[in-house]
Amino acid sequence: MEEIKKIPSRDQIPAEDKWAIEDLYPTDEAWEAELAALAESQKTLASFAGRLGESGETLYAYMEAFEQVNAKGDLLGNYCMRRADEDTRNATYQAMAGKFMGVAVALNAACSFDTPEIMAISDEKLAQFYADCPKLERYRRYLTNLRRRKAHTLSAAEEKLLASAGEMSQAPDTIYGSLADADLKFPDAVDVKGNKHPLTQGTFVSLEESSDRVLRQSAYENLYGTLASFKTTTAAILNAQNKQLKFFAEARKYDTAFEASLDATNVPTSVYKNLIETVHQNMDKMHRYVRLRKKLLGVDELHFYDVYTPLLKDVDKHIPYEQAKQTVYDALAPLGDDYRTILKNGFDHRWIDVYQNEGKRSGAYSAGTVVHPYVLLNYTGTLDSQFTLAHEMGHALHSYLSNKHQNPIDADYVIFVAEVASTCNEALLMEYLLGKTTDKKERAYLINHFLDQFKGTLYRQTMFAEFELNIGKMAAEGQTLTADVLCAEYKRLNELYYGPDMVVDDNIAMEWARIPHFYYNYYVFQYATGYSAAIALSRRILREGAPAVKDYLGFLSGGCSKSPIDLLKGAGVDMTSPEPVNQALALFGELLDEMEELTRE
């Protein structure tokens, strides 16, 4: 591993390696002017109160105004939030993000009447509205999906009250983000020669991938030791998150926050529970993988600071960003020329914020807009960074195609399908890399990475999902989620998932405190279901070619025009069945067989 250099400040990053945020608004002043105009829109929206049941024309006029306000709000929110993520210490953009949130909450309150009024329209009357006003068909999917949750919609006054509490409900996530990304400082990690390496949330995984075990252990103990010193605070934040989810779920007459969260995107709770059950049935493969890793590393004890380092050190190499882009472009050839033309456009026109800088948000994400998507990376030159590029551009092109082919109100796909688009790219990249090498060591190195993807995406994310489900149950039963409660449950699950060959210590019991997804409302299971669907789809694309690509691009262009389950069925995968998860885990077993064979001495 190359020695990590000092993390640059934002102004030291070349312009070509920063996203083109000016494509949204040329200046902060232009953004301020547009935000002021958006704030005025609440008067227009509020003027429709009490009138949505009058006629099809009135309902259409309101929906049109609502759609336009949401489209403008999307651009405004993206600008200030992307700016804030460039340097989380920058008070200007933190303030702008707060100002935007205030306007967004006011707009939500101003149109809080719409859901109860739309729910109050009878089926017969709404059918007449469509007949009288053909333009209203544009919003049929949206209105149908909204009315699906009629039993969980409150009176206009109650809806307004809940809407006005929206900003307050975001407090746990906001506070956690400020603590994790801006305020937490970690001691430098020290390598076997005594050299110091900057330790941040962003550099942690790169340090854990080092072949230097002393450095890995130092980074691991310094990160989790620091988190442990804040465990009372982080537990209180996560407890508050679960309390607010419980409050809103009960207010809307759901039995649990779990049911409320999944119903919001029309995904059956059985899909979540089937995932956990199916993974439990395949836990022997994960334990076998852990045993193999322990054997290949040649250690007496396998610790959690040993799980990221590549097993074949002499194949490990730095991948320059330009090379990573070309490799991803070449690997996605099975998706066709149209797909790759859009991909190259994104590479060439600064959709991506590439490198880490001081204060930059850790991790990676893609944010879609009607202008073009924005992708945040913290690229470090590892094989994992290359896969992250493929992953996030999968999200980006999904957003681009949905925005191109759907009305704004139908373009915003749900997370359940989002992870399919990103992970399919990763699966195609892996197939491409494996297909290019006959070298035994390089093949073993790549298969190791593929196995690590299964471990990290299917097993690990399912463990996160099970943790989230279990602590949600505790909160629902009135239990306070103290640090001791959270650590005990997290440690128990690590012992279950990693098995007897892994040392599960008190450090890893603190890992829940560095997982931001626990503030995303039963989100993480979709990484595992998405990975399973993506494995199935990537194999269909490689096997069948054009017909499968046509179905897949239709899926990517679908936005939220159908339920997520139906969109995936159209692409060729049924996620109500355990079959896709079983298929993916069967492949994991086959790869494990080959890895054992390739590394047998």
Stretches with model-predicted labels:
Residues K253, T380-Y400, S422, A427, ...:
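Active-site recognition of the HExxH zinc-binding catalytic motif
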Residues K317-I319, V370-A390:
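Short pre-active-site segment immediately N-terminal to the catalytic Zn-binding motif
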